[in-house]
């Protein structure tokens, strides 16, 4: 059963009729509903094309947060072989909001880092809804340093509403951990390819996202603050999130035009949650092409280009 978003009501109604016809046909073999089902399925495709071709920034935010959207572990299981998670920050604890480790991508060894939100109540609590604590960022820093030491390309998959803002996280140095992770991300001499697969929220995202190549899925978002947070600050009214989203330049199209990202990965009609295998396959192709291009550059060139890329963003926006 699909989790329909509020703007998907025409799709929901049509697919509901299809289910009713299929149920009728299963209960009475003398009833032939195949032609009507085919007609309705065509209308569903047309409705999805029409709706998803003109999504507003707030609607894209809803798609980016869709509970059935593939998350880091879904990508890891399909993109990589021999994925070996590494745990702990060697300082305080392990944070399951950040998943990191070593793997093979198309047979070649790589290091992998990403945020995991979870897909049910138990796993969401385990992964803190994808909001990392300081331990997660220190773990990420450790994996980056390991990748640099062994010359492993680094692939990062971003999907977080932001770093965890709890008192305990602040007491353990959340800001410092994010800054150190960002610094390490900028300093390593290996290729870094980043894909924003869902939400890219604030410093919690940028800490693992300062890549040589940064891509976004078509319906992902990337911003310095959530629309709700921006609305609360600007108007002291979080219910104006829709209005905030429209003014924040958070979509892949906006960020590509501003030069913040390098490319957009198209999603299947109806969003990545409709066809996870297709969107992950497209992501694999983009990552593969980027790594092939970057592999020809020296470590010093990779680091210099990466640092200049982000200095230019700061100067020009």
Curated annotation (Swiss-Prot):
Keywords: ATP-binding, Cytoplasm, Fatty acid biosynthesis, Fatty acid metabolism, Lipid biosynthesis, Lipid metabolism, Nucleotide-binding, Transferase. Its EC number is 2.1.3.15. The keyword Lipid metabolism applies. It is found in: Cytoplasm. It catalyses: N(6)-carboxybiotinyl-L-lysyl-[protein] + acetyl-CoA = N(6)-biotinyl-L-lysyl-[protein] + malonyl-CoA. GO terms for cellular component: acetyl-CoA carboxylase complex. Pathway: Lipid metabolism; malonyl-CoA biosynthesis; malonyl-CoA from acetyl-CoA: step 1/1. Disulfide bonds: none annotated. One of its GO terms (molecular function) is ATP binding. Signal peptide: none annotated. The keyword Cell membrane does not apply. GO terms for biological process: fatty acid biosynthetic process; malonyl-CoA biosynthetic process. InterPro entries: Acetyl_CoA_COase_a_su, ClpP/crotonase-like_dom_sf, COA_CT_C. It is an enzyme of class 2 (transferase). Residues 40-293 form the CoA carboxyltransferase C-terminal domain. Acetyl-CoA carboxylase is a heterohexamer composed of biotin carboxyl carrier protein (AccB), biotin carboxylase (AccC) and two subunits each of ACCase subunit alpha (AccA) and ACCase subunit beta (AccD). PANTHER family: ACETYL-COENZYME A CARBOXYLASE CARBOXYL TRANSFERASE SUBUNIT ALPHA (PTHR42853), ACETYL-COENZYME A CARBOXYLASE CARBOXYL TRANSFERASE SUBUNIT ALPHA, CHLOROPLASTIC (PTHR42853:SF3). Component of the acetyl coenzyme A carboxylase (ACC) complex. First, biotin carboxylase catalyzes the carboxylation of biotin on its carrier protein (BCCP) and then the CO(2) group is transferred by the carboxyltransferase to acetyl-CoA to form malonyl-CoA. Belongs to the AccA family. This is Acetyl-coenzyme A carboxylase carboxyl transferase subunit alpha. It comes from Sinorhizobium medicae (strain WSM419) (Ensifer medicae).
């Amino acid at each position: 059963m699909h989790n329909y978003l509020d703007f998907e009501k025409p799709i929901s109604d049509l697919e509901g009729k299809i289910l009713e016809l299929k149920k009728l046909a299963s209960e009475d073999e003398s009833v032939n509903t195949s032609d009507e089902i085919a007609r309705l399925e065509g209308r569903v495709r047309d409705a999805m094309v029409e709706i998803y071709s003109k999504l507003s920034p707030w609607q894209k935010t809803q798609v980016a947060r869709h509970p059935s959207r593939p998350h880091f572990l879904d990508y890891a299981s399909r993109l990589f072989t021999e994925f070996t998670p590494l745990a702990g920050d060697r300082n305080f604890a392990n944070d399951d909001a950040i998943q990191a480790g070593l793997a093979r991508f198309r047979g070649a060894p790589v290091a992998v880092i990403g945020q995991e939100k979870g897909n049910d109540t138990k796993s969401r609590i385990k992964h803190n809804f994808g909001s990392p604590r300081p331990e997660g960022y220190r773990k990420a820093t450790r994996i980056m340093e390991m990748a640099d030491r062994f010359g492993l390309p680094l692939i990062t998959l971003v999907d977080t509403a932001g770093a965890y803002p709890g008192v305990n996280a602040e007491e353990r140095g959340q800001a410092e951990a994010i800054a150190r992770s960002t610094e390490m991300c900028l300093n390593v001499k290996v290729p870094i390819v980043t894909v924003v697969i869902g939400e890219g929220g604030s410093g919690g995202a940028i800490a693992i996202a300062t890549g040589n190549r940064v891509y976004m899925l078509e319906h992902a978002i990337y911003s310095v603050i959530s629309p709700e947070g921006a609305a609360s600050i600007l108007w002291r009214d979080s219910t104006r999130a829709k209005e905030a989203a429209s003014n924040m330049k958070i979509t892949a199209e906006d960020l590509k035009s501003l030069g913040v990202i390098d490319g957009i990965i198209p999603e299947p009609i109806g969003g990545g949650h409709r066809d996870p295998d297709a969107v992950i396959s497209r992501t694999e192709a983009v990552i593969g092409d980027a790594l092939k291009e970057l592999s020809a550059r020296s470590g010093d060139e990779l680091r210099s280009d990466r640092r200049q890329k982000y200095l230019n963003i700061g100067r020009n926006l």
